[in-house]
Amino acid sequence: MSRPTGPQFWPPFKPCPCGSGRSYAACCQPFHTGERDAPTPEALMRSRYAAYALADADYVRRTWHPDTVPAELDLNDGVKYTGLRIHRAEGDEVEFTASMKGPDGQPHNMRERSRFVQLDGRWVYLDAAE
């Protein structure tokens, strides 16, 4: 039996999965609940990473540009997100490495330079820069 996932199951007093060092309630939870929008591309990147870690596909889709969002998104694929390192956040781009363990338990790192745009006054993920 798998354990429940999603932001509603992450205690607000625990450290935020984005690795900021702050509690979830003081970091990404207000973005996940829709209480506030992420004010910067880096804050959005961190909140999206936390959403992946918590299997919150609704938030990931909600913060993805409608022209580039995939038709299907499965965050219950057995991947365990283990860390986020921001290398650079400048303008509308954030370069980061996401660490994870695959369903087979093997560690993986994904490095990406993400591009963000403002849509209707809020930041959304556009794509990975080439």
From Swiss-Prot:
Matching SUPFAM superfamilies: NTF2-like
UniProt-listed InterPro entries: NTF2-like_dom_sf (IPR032710), SEC_C_motif (IPR004027), UPF0225 (IPR023006), YchJ-like_M (IPR048469)
Assigned protein family: Belongs to the UPF0225 family.
Phylogenetic lineage: Bacteria, Thermotogati, Deinococcota, Deinococci, Deinococcales
Protein name as annotated: UPF0225 protein DR_0483
Organism of derivation: Deinococcus radiodurans (strain ATCC 13939 / DSM 20539 / JCM 16871 / CCUG 27074 / LMG 4051 / NBRC 15346 / NCIMB 9279 / VKM B-1422 / R1)
A Pfam match: YchJ_M-like
